[in-house]
Amino acid sequence: EKIDPRQYPYIIENKRLTFVGEGWKSGLWSIMQFDPETHFVLPNTGDNLGWRPYDATEVKPGLVRLADPKREANKRFPAPGTILVLRHSTRDHAGIFIYHSTDTKLENLKLFHTCGLGILSQYSKNIAFNDVHIIPNAAKGRVLSGHDDGFHFMGCSGLLKIENCSWAGLMDDPINIHGTCSRIMEVLSPTRIKCKFMQDMSEGMEWGRPDEMIGFIEHNTMRTVATGKMNKFEALNKAEFIIELSAPLPAGVEAGYVIENLTCTPDAEIRNCHFGSCRARGLLVSTPGKVVIENNIFESSGSAILIAGDANAWYESGAVKDVLIRNNDFRYPCNSSIYQFCEAVISIDPEIPTPEQKYPYHRNIRIVDNTFHLFDYPILFARSVDGLTFSDNTLIRDTIYQPYHYRKEGITLEACKSVVISNNKIEGDVLGRTVKFDRMKSSDIKISKNPFFRKLK
């Protein structure tokens, strides 16, 4: 196969493959490998950066040779027949943008390609997607459907209802639901604080509106120490803004703390969807609203479900308080490649520099009545959760691929409490038999009606 220079014009510049367009050019910065039969991301490839030290030479028009000049970096080369997606350019614009809207419904849609996020929703209330698919155009033989996330929700409220949807071939997560933390840079007066968007992809947003509630967070422990109400929002530039509070700043809150919008926090229902093989994870959810995830099929390359939240890197806020993960089918290739936060098939992985068990970040997560097809050890990873249930699930050994993950425990717990693991059914020689825990006591874990799992300090 060759690069079609009519569809994808390119040049070789300084021994680098560079794609060109009208008024722009962009060098190759990532390569994804897809199975030619299943169109799954090939296992244990993911964000493999070993190919980056390369020299490009044109063998003939459309045929480019990429060679490691030192013959050192690549320990694994793509097999003949592998489909390569050559990633270049930057996140451009969303295919569909929903902004400051109410009661929006999309249905019976297919998006074959977007140059950025598939559907971006911001500061909108009550959104319903039914029978919406972001998938490659099979008629053209494509495996790529989008540059970034599929459905991306930031700062929304009301109910997000997603049913009968599917995704495949995305270069990021099919669904991401979150808010945005911003840092307090300066206390200007008892009622005025100067804040900053710490992630450049958040810059330019309207962080909040009058009468919306604010949480004040100590970023090392991610503990919400106080709340307040916003009276006025004033943008200074794309990155910085001033918030006027309706009452004096709570005692102890100072520069370096972060703020979270507690009003723009939706409920979410995600049912009967197919999370096909995409780069990275399947479903990311960070909202304190009620969340139901049920009757879905997951075939993600990384973790199927990520529950994160942080004020230290991505600044995506939303400590969960009520999450039900029920009757889903987690299939290969779930967690078959390593990406950020992919600690297990289900990864509850908030970025907390110093997690303290007495200040849990997430609460009330139930993982029940699901089926896991497992070729590797890690099933569940959880940090800083109060009230975690893993019960009545069916765990089935799958030998489609060899174990590779650095974690060798089935369940890993850190700074959690009130954990229940019970009545899980085992089929075959499932590998992850141990429960590893840290920053917590053995008595914080209750294992019953199942001799399979055993505790390991």
PLM region spans:
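Extracellular polysaccharide-degrading/modifying enzymes targeting complex plant/algal/animal polysaccharides
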Residues: 1-112, 120, 136-144, 168-169, ...
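Solenoid scaffold repeats with emphasis on beta-solenoid/beta-helix
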Residues: 96-99, 103-104, 109, 122, ...
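Short glycine/acidic-rich loop motifs that flank beta-strands on beta-rich extracellular proteins
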Residues: 93-94, 115-120, 137-149, 171-177, ...
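Long amphipathic alpha-helical scaffold regions
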Residues: 124-159, 188-202, 295-334, 395-420, ...
